Structure formats: C-alpha cells, structure tokens
C-alpha cells in the first residue's frame, strides 16, 4: 500500500504597504518627474552642456535687458513735467538790425513773394516713441552719486588748480559771459550787423575760381537729383534722407554767399522760406542738427542780414530744447522735433562727450541774438558740469558720459578722434567767441594741450612724423583718425589769439603729418584712419592703412587746418598743399553727371571705388575752407572778427579783442 499523500501547504496572504511619510500617492506624477531626470541623465555630456549654455545665455540677456529698461525709466523720470514746461515756445523773433523796408542787396524780388504751401516730405518709416515714466528712488540715487562725484572733483581742483600764464599774461579769476537778463529780453537787438563779419571781397583769383567751379558741379548734381533732400547719391543719381530737412542745402547757404553765388543763394533761400518746416515727426541727432542746421541758419543770417534765417533758427532751437530734460542736464543724443520727445540711443543711456560739448557756440549765439537766455543757460550748465567732473587725465576726457548720472563712462580711454575731438576745439572757440573773458574755458584748453603732449604725442619711422595716437587703459595705440587733423588749425588759431608759441611748433609738425597722410596715398587723398609705424623696418612707410580704413569721405579737417596755418603764417606752401588736394578730389571723386562721391580705396588710383554719397560737409566745409585758403584777402572772414563752428559756419566774436 502506498502511504497517503502529504497534506497541501497552507495558503499564505501577503500585504504590501507603501510608506509615503504623509504624502498621498498621486498616480504617476512623481514617476514622471523621475522619468525626466532619467531622460536628462541619458543625454550625452555635450548635449547637456549645450542646453545649459543656451539657458545661461538667455538668462544673461534677460538680465542685461532689465538693466537697460531700468536705465531708460530712470532717465525719463519727471520728463513729462519738464517737457510740458519746455514745449515748443512760440516767442516773437526780434528783427534783424535794419529798417523794416530795408532788404539785403539783390533780394527784393524774393522777399516780396508770397509764401506758398508746400508738399511736405517725411523720411520713410518714422517711428513714434511714447514717453515713459520712472521711479523717484532711481533719480535720488543718481543725484546722490552725482553730488558725491562732483564734490570729489571740486576737492581735487581746489588742491591742484594753478594759475596759468602765457607770454607773461596771467589768467584772472573767471569772468563768466552772462546770458541776457529777463529785463533785457524785450529790448535786446542783434549786436552784429552783417557788415561786421562780411564785406564784399575782391574778384576771385584763379584758384578760387577752381573752387567755384567745383562747387557748381557739386550743386548741379544736388539740384538735379536731390533738391530739398538731405544728401546726394551722385552715382545712382538719387538722394538719401537722414532728417528730411534739406541738410545739404542749409549746410551750403553760407558757402554760396561767400563764393558770390547769389543766384544759387536766392533759389536756396526760396526753398527755406517755402519748404523748410520743422513741424514733422522725426528724430534728429542733437549734435549733428545743431552744428549743421542751427549753425547754418545763424551764419546765413549774419552774412545776409535776412531775418528769415534767424526766425527759422529760433524755431529750430526751441524744438531741440527737450533734449536737455535729463536728470543730470547732460542732453540726450536724439530728440523728436515734432513731438518734443527726447531720448538716448536704444542701445545705451550714454551720450558722447564731443556731442554734448560741441553745441555751445550755436546755442550761446542764439541767446545773444534773440534775448532768450534758456539756450545759453542749458549749454553752459553742461560746460560747467564737464569742467567739474573727475575722471580726466591731465585735461584729457573720456569719450562717453551717462545722461542719468552725469558721470564719465568707459574711463581710461582717451582720443582726439571721433567722440571726443570737438570738445577740445570748442573750449578754445567759446573763449574767443565770448571776448576772451571766460578763463575757465582757456584753462581747460591749455591743460588739455599739455595732456596731449604728455600722453598722446609720438613720432613715426623713418621720417619722424609727429602724430597723435590713442590711449586705452595705459596702453598706447599708434592710430590717428583723419578727424584729428582739425588740431593743427585749432592750435594755430590759439597762437593767433595769444597762446604760447610752442603751440605753433606743434601745429606745423602735425600739419606736415596730415599732409603726408594724403601725399603717401596713390590718390593723394587721406584714408579715414591711419596707423603709424613706430619702429625702423625695411620697406615700411610711416603711414600704414588697414583695408577697413582706406576710404575717404570728402572730409574737411586737413584743408581746414591748412586755412588756419596759412592765415597765421602766410606761408604759401599751405595754399599749394590745398591745391593738390582739390586736384585729387577732381580726379578721383568727381562724378560726370554732377556731384562728388566718397571713395572706398585711397590706395588704388585705378579703381578708387565710389561709395555713391556726397556728405553735406563737402559743400558746407571742405570747399568753403579751400576758397578761404586761396583768398588773397586775409581779412575775408578774419580770425579777429568771427569764429567758425565745427561745421565751418562763421559766427561773430562778441567783443573783438
């Protein structure tokens, strides 16, 4: 018998318990999180690094954008009230110093014409910017920062300032040139008749006739293809707009008068009367529009005596005033002349030092002529502020200044090229304009020249040409912009007005260098930027040009300085050098159908490559200075009678010494 089978094992039940530590089970949410982490871990190291880099870059961009937005909001704090306060005023324009019935010679037929309605031209794609607001706390912080910086600068000046003397003359404590008082506003008259800065010159000589012919050729192209527009594009026979205000026409008004082109002047004057309307929704650059438009109108008024130009100048000056509604009173770079909204560029809240310190001649003169003191007060506040700032190096200034804090930015970089050049020029010219009374201006100018000698002056090899380089955080760069060629002329002007004789030695040396910057090029025209060889090397010239810098924009700085050097020294070699440059312009930049074009390559006489643009300063400055350089009459717009703004527009000296 088989034994009975064993009894089956008893059935066991198992219970699974999940300890969640108080957290409820939510189906699959936690599992999904763990799944994402596992997916991340499954990525390669390269993939994870790329994702992290992109995320970091986006976070950084967001942070920088928030800072920029914060700056813009701070900058516009309280702007509504100030803009309303400075809304375009319609103030009575004081008449020119002449009888109502008197008219400039040869203008009776124009002045009697009725004003006609015109078709308004507006630049394409205008952008309207709404005004912004900002917190008061930001403004208070900026104000405290400015106050601390200015206090430090004042303390430094009190300990370091010395009395400067030249040729035995001691500079007295500053005598400010006061703006017109309120009491005088109703009765003030323009102090200078047209005859004070203008007299009919002798008939033009042969070289001057060459300049007149060049101007008429340029003007033919402008009249035919760009009349009433900003700039001529002579190769394509069309035009380009910047502000849509007839920039070339206004810039050339005084040139036509000086060259004796009265018929062309009449036609341009008619356009100004009938078509120049500033009530348009367009942004203009404060600096460029001041030196070209405001300066051009004031100069045309002084030369012709025609009150139309003064009326237009006052209107335009009023429309520029909102640019000064910043927390620091350092003006914005741009202003909409139709809406009155002023602002910094989109990419920064900085203005350049040259821009904010090279509008003073024009605004001061506008106050003097109209009796409206706000123009002069606004720009002189800027001048005093810059004078008091720390961050300079022996009189040299950085290139940028913040409109919110009023402090220099990008410190340690010093140049006499773009963004700083005309600061130094206007120190001297304001001193001359005001009758040599504002010694603070002269003091800053003389100190700056000493700073140039100490830090920026070098000599090239092998010909030992003296040049002005740049300094960046203690490191010298042998780079010189063509713009720096304004300096020899400014130095010579200072010597003419009594500054040290060694300034003339430097002026002569730099003038030779600027001439060689033209002479050593195959076309005889200077590049935009030159680099100088400082070490003896075989087969190396003193002047070297990089491919990106070898263009020529028809700039005036070299011939401007030739004009001053000839006026002061009477050395005819400077006239000869100017004649060579004019011939080079005719040979390599002249367009047969009319006009002159900037070129891409000054080192290729066979293919200079026209850029198809004639800047307004070619007819406003370059040809004007050449005409005056060739004049046999040294009293034609004499250096004791008028001072030229940085766009070559002559303005009268208030109290000739």
From Swiss-Prot:
Residues 1-49 are cytoplasmic. It is a single-pass type II membrane protein. One of its GO terms (cellular component) is membrane. This is Endoplasmic reticulum mannosyl-oligosaccharide 1,2-alpha-mannosidase. Ca(2+) binds at residue 646. The chain crosses the membrane at residues 50-70. Involved in glycoprotein quality control targeting of misfolded glycoproteins for degradation. It primarily trims a single alpha-1,2-linked mannose residue from Man(9)GlcNAc(2) to produce Man(8)GlcNAc(2), but at high enzyme concentrations, as found in the ER quality control compartment (ERQC), it further trims the carbohydrates to Man(5-6)GlcNAc(2). Disulfide bonds join 485-514. PANTHER family: ENDOPLASMIC RETICULUM MANNOSYL-OLIGOSACCHARIDE 1,2-ALPHA-MANNOSIDASE, MANNOSYL-OLIGOSACCHARIDE ALPHA-1,2-MANNOSIDASE-RELATED. InterPro entries: 6hp_glycosidase-like_sf, Glyco_hydro_47, Glycosyl_Hydrolase_47, Seven-hairpin_glycosidases. Residues 118-157 are annotated as: Disordered. The active site is at residues 288, 421, 528, 557. GO terms for molecular function: calcium ion binding; mannosyl-oligosaccharide 1,2-alpha-mannosidase activity. It is an enzyme of class 3 (hydrolase). The keyword Hydrolase applies. Its cofactor is Ca(2+). It comes from Rattus norvegicus (Rat). Belongs to the glycosyl hydrolase 47 family.
């Amino acid at each position: 018998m088989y034994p009975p089978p064993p009894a089956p094992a008893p059935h066991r039940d198992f219970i699974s318990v999940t300890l969640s530590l108080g957290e409820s089970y939510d189906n699959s949410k936690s599992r999904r999180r763990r799944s994402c982490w596992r997916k991340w871990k499954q990525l390669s190291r390269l993939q994870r690094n790329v994702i992290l880099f992109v995320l970091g870059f986006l976070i950084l961009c967001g942070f920088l954008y928030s800072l920029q937005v914060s700056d813009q909001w701070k900058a516009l704090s309280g702007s509504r009230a100030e803009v309303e306060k400075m809304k375009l005023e319609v103030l009575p324009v004081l008449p020119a110093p002449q009888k109502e019935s008197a008219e400039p010679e040869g203008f009776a037929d124009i002045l009697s014409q009725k004003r006609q309605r015109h078709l308004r031209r507006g630049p394409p794609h205008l952008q309207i910017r709404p005004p912004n607001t900002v917190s008061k706390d930001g403004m208070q912080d900026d104000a405290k920062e400015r106050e601390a910086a200015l206090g430090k600068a004042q303390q430094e000046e009190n300990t370091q300032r010395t009395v400067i003397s030249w040729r035995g003359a001691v500079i007295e404590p500053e005598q400010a040139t006061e703006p017109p008082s309120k009491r005088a506003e109703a009765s003030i008259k323009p102090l200078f008749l047209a005859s004070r800065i203008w007299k009919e010159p002798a008939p033009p000589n042969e070289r001057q006739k060459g300049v007149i012919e060049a101007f008429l050729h340029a003007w033919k192209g402008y009249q035919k293809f760009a009349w009433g527009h900003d700039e001529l594009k002579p190769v394509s026979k069309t035009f380009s707009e910047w502000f849509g205000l007839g920039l070339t026409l206004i810039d050339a008004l005084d040139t036509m008068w000086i060259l004796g082109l009265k018929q062309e002047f009449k036609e341009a004057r008619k356009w100004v009367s009938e078509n120049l309307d500033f009530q348009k929704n367009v942004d203009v650059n404060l600096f460029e529009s001041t030196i070209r438009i405001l300066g051009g109108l004031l100069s045309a008024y002084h030369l012709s005596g025609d009150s139309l130009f003064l009326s237009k100048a006052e209107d335009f000056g009023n429309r520029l005033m909102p640019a000064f509604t910043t927390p620091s009173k350092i003006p914005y770079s741009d202003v909409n002349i139709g809406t009155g909204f002023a602002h910094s560029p989109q990419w920064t809240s900085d203005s350049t030092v040259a821009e904010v310190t090279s509008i003073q001649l024009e605004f001061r003169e506008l106050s003097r002529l109209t009796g409206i003191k706000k123009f002069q007060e606004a720009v002189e506040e800027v001048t005093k502020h810059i004078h008091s700032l720390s961050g300079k190096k022996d009189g040299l200034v950085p290139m940028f200044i913040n409109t919110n804090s009023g402090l220099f930015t990008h410190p340690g970089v010093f140049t006499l090229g773009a963004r700083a050049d005309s600061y130094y020029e206007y120190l001297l010219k304001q001193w001359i304009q005001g009758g040599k009374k504002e010694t603070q201006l002269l003091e800053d100018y003389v100190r700056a020249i000493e700073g140039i000698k100490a830090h920026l002056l070098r000599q090239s090899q092998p010909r030992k040409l003296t040049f002005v380089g740049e300094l960046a955080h203690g490191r010298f760069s042998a780079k010189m912009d063509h713009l720096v060629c304004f300096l020899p002329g400014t130095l010579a002007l200072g010597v003419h007005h009594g500054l040290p004789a060694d300034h003339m030695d430097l002026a002569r040396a730099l003038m030779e260098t600027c001439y060689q910057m033209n002479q050593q090029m195959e076309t005889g025209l200077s590049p935009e930027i030159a680099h100088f060889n400082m070490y003896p090397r075989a087969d190396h010239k003193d002047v070297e040009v990089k491919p990106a810098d070898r263009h020529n924009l028809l700039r005036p700085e070299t011939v401007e300085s030739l004009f001053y050097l000839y006026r002061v020294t009477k050395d005819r070699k400077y006239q000869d050098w100017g004649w060579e440059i004019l011939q080079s312009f005719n040979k390599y930049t002249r367009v047969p159908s009319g006009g002159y074009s900037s070129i891409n390559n000054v080192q290729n006489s066979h293919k200079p490559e026209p850029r198809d643009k004639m800047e307004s300063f070619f007819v406003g400055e370059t040809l004007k200075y050449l005409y005056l350089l060739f004049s046999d009459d040294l009293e034609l717009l004499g250096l004791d009678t008028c001072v030229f703004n940085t766009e070559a527009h002559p303005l009268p000296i208030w109290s000739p010494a």
